[in-house]
Amino acid sequence: MRKILKQFLAFCIITLVPFHAFSKTYNLDIAYKSVNITGNFVKKIAINGTIPGPILRFVEGEEVEINVINNLDEDTSIHWHGILLPGEMDGVPGLNGFPGIKPGEAFTYRFKIRQTGTYWYHSHSKGQEQDGEFGALIIDFKDADPVKFDRDYVVLLSDFHEENASNILANLKMSSEYYQYARRTLTDFFYSVEKHGFRRAWENALMWGKMRMLPTDLADVTG
């Protein structure tokens, strides 16, 4: 009789434990992909086969689960930029005990959505973000949106370079002006003298000489 009572109590305890169901689950497959944007095929990193990755859409208050599978030959990660969440779910390797995701392994992010707005997610490992591992993240209001609109468009801007990010970083370490193809020449100085006079042209040249960027440098990486 006592044995039956114990089994009955155990059954009651098990059935009373709440089952935690997640409101939304996404699976993100990180893998290399050959892409042609400039007319040449180059190796980049895609999420679920696309660059940028898929738009992740949530609703305020949802409990979400995101499974990230690493099919690269190096560690990877996903950081949820601007999202309020537990530290261990932030996705920055080396912080809050998160080691990153090893090749061939997966990691499941679980957190509750506590805000609304337009955000983005991206790798926080090496230069993988620059190589294509990023995407948009939209969080809708739980109740009616305070702003009326006919249609919601998501615009995600990004630079693209045929070189991989590790090569770009190595080149910039050799010289911060490595990609500065339109550098000023002596001819430009004479043109400035003709237009503004020698004194102003000389002072202008000295001023730029003290700076870390050239006047023709519109971006860190060009071409």
What spans do the regions from the language model cover?
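Cleavable N-terminal signal peptides
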Residues: 10-11, 21
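Histidine-centered copper-binding motifs that mark active-site loops
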Residues: 23-223
